[in-house]
Amino acid sequence: MRQLCIILCLAAAPAWAGWTSVAEATGTRTYADPATIKRHGDVAAMWWVRDYQDFQRMVEVGYFSHKTLAEYDCRQMRSRGLSTSLHEGHMGEGKAIYADETAHDWEEIVPETEGEALWKVACG
């Protein structure tokens, strides 16, 4: 019976249970998912999500979260987005109202920013 309770509790856990809060600003919180880190030499890839307290508007639709797969150059302290989507629900849940799977150019990471916090998680 105890095992059944544990299984049911784990199954009921929210989909965002693995997210780790890494940065916070007025009305937003940014989370990284360390379980998604994939390393290839000096480059690490990881999913992260920015969750908005208030509904954000884009033309005629809106969203509560922004989910991104990014690559991090652990040696040169830079990053680039590989895939981004905007979601109707919090924590990257719900319908994606926008998606872009374009690999963007590498950008230097600015110290003491959300980007640096994410880079530290991805690169250890």
Regions found by a protein language model. Name each.
Residues 4-13:
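Sec-dependent N-terminal signal peptides
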Residues 15-124:
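N-terminal secretory-pathway/extracellular module detecting exported/lumenal segments
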